[in-house]
């Protein structure tokens, strides 16, 4: 059990590792290849575009060829891309390697959830999703620091050697076969979509969009407007991640994850930003409660999104993964663009995340109404 648990956690974390570890190396890569910063940003932005498409495709391919087989093949692709990046002497070779990495990374977060759904009983599944979400949150916390430490002693291409080793370890942990707890389920020929799938997908998309807005706007708020140094902001961001992880672990306890309470707390937590408060203490407290409340419901939202008809969990997870990635990227992009109107970074963050919290409350309400109607019909 521990081996499959660790395997799924590593598989879910690969995309975060691939994007966050090279962030400290971007200025170094710019100098190494003698190019402008916007071009070198393609190593991240281009990666994310291909990664989103790979997420969508991997679920469909996994249903046809087998999820475990496709996941192993994807890590072999990621390994090949990492080696190509490690050996690259031109920008085009580096970008080609990153493209291969992105294709390989797309299957990890998607198929790990699908495999967890088919392998674990519902109670264990909720705990597994909490741990997978926590591990995925830890990687963005550790990866940039690890990248900076490596760059302090070795060349930039050593980062890709670490990624290659990560993929090798994950492949070695791959189980030979999967034990399905719900093997008696008969595949549905009428499609997999259920109201719960739609509502769960909307919820994870709204939650991730809120997080992306915070990640995009909080540096300007705390460093430019409130005067924190880069180091102090890094510590604050680390604390935010830790509160998100704490929320993930709270999700294991049913009594602690009332969605109405959590999203109301989430909405209230951004009031200091809406009011343009200059109190550093209030803004920090709001940030911590913001991340805690989102983290507490994120695993449950993923669990809801996996409640489908039939056994096409790979396709369902890939559709959810694609929608949440595209939604979060698009919404956070337009939130940042709003600052060009003179609205201010703090008020932009507050208003955008408040709207997302209210939309989440609306989705939760429709979810509960659907559950009530379904239960009533079944009686």
Language-model segments: what does each one mean?
Residues 3-37, 58, 214-219:
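Extracytoplasmic
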Residues 34, 66, 87-93, 104, ...:
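Helix-breaking motifs and short loop linkers at transmembrane-helix boundaries and internal kinks
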Residues 306-345, 352-353:
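A late C-terminal transmembrane helix in Major Facilitator Superfamily
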Residues 233-254:
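Transmembrane alpha-helices of Major Facilitator/SLC transporters
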Residues 122-175:
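Helix-loop-helix hairpin linking two adjacent transmembrane segments in secondary transporters
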Residues 97-136:
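Cytoplasmic helix-loop-helix junction between adjacent transmembrane helices
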Residues 77, 81-84, 92-100, 281-289:
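Paired small-residue
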Residues 53-91:
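Conserved MFS/SLC helix-loop-helix module at the cytosolic interface between two early adjacent transmembrane helices
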